């Protein structure tokens, strides 16, 4: 209580005239009471934790200190004690029904203070503090912000089954989501391509399961996977940053990775991407697979929630599907987990009961889930509407990029599909989640291509799911703010260029010995960009050489000794035929 009183006294001391306007952050603050003037924090200072709260808030302060360094170049030390002039002060206060677990109070006067009933609220307060300091060039408008989310679940789902994303990318995404107060990151760990694009041959159809398995050697994808330790470390990082990493193992459809490994559990009738629900071996396999990640004192799936898929099974097997779903909802729950699934029960109607208590459904399609009936039955739902919230890169159906303006100006969390809208505050409507599905395996889309699509979506949906009401400013103002905001402290996946680019130790010429190079001050350049260069090939040169290289891509001359120019990003190679003996001037790669 004393910490809250301290902040309130700080607010009362602010001059009543010349009120400061509400600071610009994403998502926008719920409440702001402006004071007079600005608090200019020093480039070297202190983060002070209330002595009684050190155990709960030390990790928050440590992350904040590193973020101040990465974002602004500031050096802040962490200590405990009482508030100090021009310092950042973190503390906990008594429970507050409106603030809940995620709300906080941020006040700027003699010092910058963040207080909240729970650690998570203080952490979200530091995200707002960082954004304000970035946008205000190191200053804080004096005043008091009171902020809380309208919806508790605000997330993003990434299909890593059809396309591998590096663990480094996933770890960076935890920080990006956290910076915009998106608190769920669902990892879709297995899936497969469409058989019609692989000569209608299930054996040729791409499929992958991305997690290390000791019980089933050979199950894990060979073209990219995560060790158990890497995945548990990712979840721990999420906990540190307030992001719940939710693993999804998709069964009983989308399961070709499992039937490639164990063909006898595949369905001859509906296709090998369907598990055969009539074979005991299917249940033995799934039981053991789930147990591998759920059992033990330190399970691999260490968070509170686990997703079991359950979407798009053939409707002719509704009763057996409902039995299977009910069985695995109960099976996963016995390990102490909250279970999630994709909506399917409108499409697969039947008499077989399916557990509803403590089960959360992704409401993704009008045809597959009845949101009102689901809520009535006792399920909780998360709006993951395919029409508005699905990104399927370069597929030609669904959306390649989300309609950011429409989402900002029109969409609400309650708009669960194109025909049904739930009122704001509907009990059981937990929030929303947007999703990336990489349906077309190997289509040339890179990690950076996906991020180019998802980052603007994350910004606008963070705004809509946190505030839960009409936009604070016009779309044009919001879009301008989005473009000036960083992805997160220390992260530049977009490859934005700031300042002058120089060539350290610039040389007039390079020794063509295969080892000489020149480096720029910039590791990479993001979209949109164009590269122009002249190539004077040596007719006698018979080796592949690197023209340009960054952390995520490489441009080769004489790719594989075939006389081609090649652009390579992760596992994707794009080749261009060039004359082998003549100089090529102004060859443009965009």
What do these predicted ranges mean?
Residues 354-359, 366-508:
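Flexible, acidic glycine-rich loops studded with aromatic residues
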Residues 17-149, 339-348, 355-357, 487, ...:
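Acidic, contiguous N-terminal accessory segments
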Residues 47, 68, 118, 156, ...:
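Conserved, mostly hydrophobic/aromatic
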Residues 502-573:
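Extracellular glycan-recognition modules
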Residues 1-22:
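Bacterial Sec-dependent N-terminal signal peptides
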Residues 567-589:
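Short, aromatic/His-centered strand-loop micro-motif at the edge of beta-sheets
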Residues 97-274, 281, 287-305, 438-440:
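Feature activates predominantly on carbohydrate-active enzymes
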Residues 258-360, 364-378:
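Active-site neighborhood of glycoside hydrolase catalytic domains
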């Amino acid at each position: 209580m004393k910490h809250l009183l301290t902040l309130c006294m700080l607010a009362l001391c602010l001059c009543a005239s010349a009120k400061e306007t509400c600071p610009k952050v994403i998502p926008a603050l719920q409440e702001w009471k402006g004071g007079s003037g600005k608090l200019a924090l020093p480039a070297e200072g202190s983060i002070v934790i209330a002595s009684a709260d050190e155990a709960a808030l030390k990790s928050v302060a440590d992350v904040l200190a590193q973020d101040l360094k990465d974002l602004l170049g500031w050096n802040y030390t962490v200590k405990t004690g009482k508030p100090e002039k021009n310092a950042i002060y973190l503390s906990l206060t008594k429970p507050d029904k409106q603030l809940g677990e995620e709300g906080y109070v941020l006040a700027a006067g003699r010092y910058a203070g963040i207080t909240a009933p729970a650690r998570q609220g203080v952490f979200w307060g530091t995200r707002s503090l960082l954004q304000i300091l970035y946008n205000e060039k190191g200053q804080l408008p004096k005043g008091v912000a009171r902020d809380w989310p309208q919806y508790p679940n605000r997330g993003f789902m990434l299909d890593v089954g059809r396309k591998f994303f590096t663990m480094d990318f996933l770890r960076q995404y935890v920080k990006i989501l956290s910076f915009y107060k998106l608190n769920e990151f669902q990892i879709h760990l297995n899936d497969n391509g469409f058989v019609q694009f692989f000569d209608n041959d299930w054996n040729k159809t791409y499929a992958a399961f991305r997690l290390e398995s000791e019980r089933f050697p050979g199950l894990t994808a060979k073209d990219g996977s995560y060790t158990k330790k890497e995945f548990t470390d990712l979840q721990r990082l999420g906990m540190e940053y307030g992001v719940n990493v939710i693993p999804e193992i998709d069964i009983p459809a989308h399961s070709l990775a499992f039937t490639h490994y164990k063909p006898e559990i595949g369905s001859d009738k509906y296709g090998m991407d369907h598990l055969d629900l009539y074979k005991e071996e299917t249940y033995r396999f799934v039981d053991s697979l789930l147990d591998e990640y759920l059992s033990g004192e330190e399970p691999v799936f260490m968070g509170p929630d686990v997703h079991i898929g359950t979407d798009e099974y053939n409707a002719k097997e509704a009763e057996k599907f409902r039995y299977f779903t009910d069985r695995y909802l109960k099976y996963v729950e016995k390990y102490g987990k909250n279970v999630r699934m994709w909506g399917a029960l409108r499409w697969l109607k039947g008499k077989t009961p399916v557990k509803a208590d403590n089960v959360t459904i992704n409401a993704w399609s009008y045809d597959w889930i009845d949101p009102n009936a689901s809520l009535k039955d006792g399920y909780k739902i998360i709006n993951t509407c395919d029409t508005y919230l699905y990104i399927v890169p370069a597929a030609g159906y669904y959306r390649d990029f989300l309609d950011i303006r429409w989402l900002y100006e029109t969409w609400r969390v309650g708009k669960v599909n194109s025909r049904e809208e739930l009122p704001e505050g509907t009990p059981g409507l937990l929030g929303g989640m947007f999703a990336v599905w990489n349906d077309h395996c190997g289509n040339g889309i890179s990690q950076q291509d996906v991020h180019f699509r998802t980052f603007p979506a994350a910004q606008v949906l963070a705004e809509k799911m946190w505030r839960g009401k009409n936009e604070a400013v016009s779309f044009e103002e919001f879009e301008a703010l989005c473009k000036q905001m960083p992805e997160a402290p220390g992260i530049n996946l977009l490859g934005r260029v700031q300042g002058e680019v120089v060539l350290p130790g610039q040389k007039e010429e390079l020794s063509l010995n295969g080892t000489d190079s020149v480096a720029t001050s910039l590791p990479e350049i993001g979209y949109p960009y164009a590269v122009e260069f002249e190539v004077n090939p040596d007719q006698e040169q018979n080796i592949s050489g690197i023209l340009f290289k960054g952390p995520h891509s490489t441009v080769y001359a004489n790719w594989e000794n075939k006389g081609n120019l090649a652009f390579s990003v992760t596992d994707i190679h794009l080749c261009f035929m060039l004359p082998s003996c003549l100089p090529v001037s102004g060859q443009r790669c965009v």
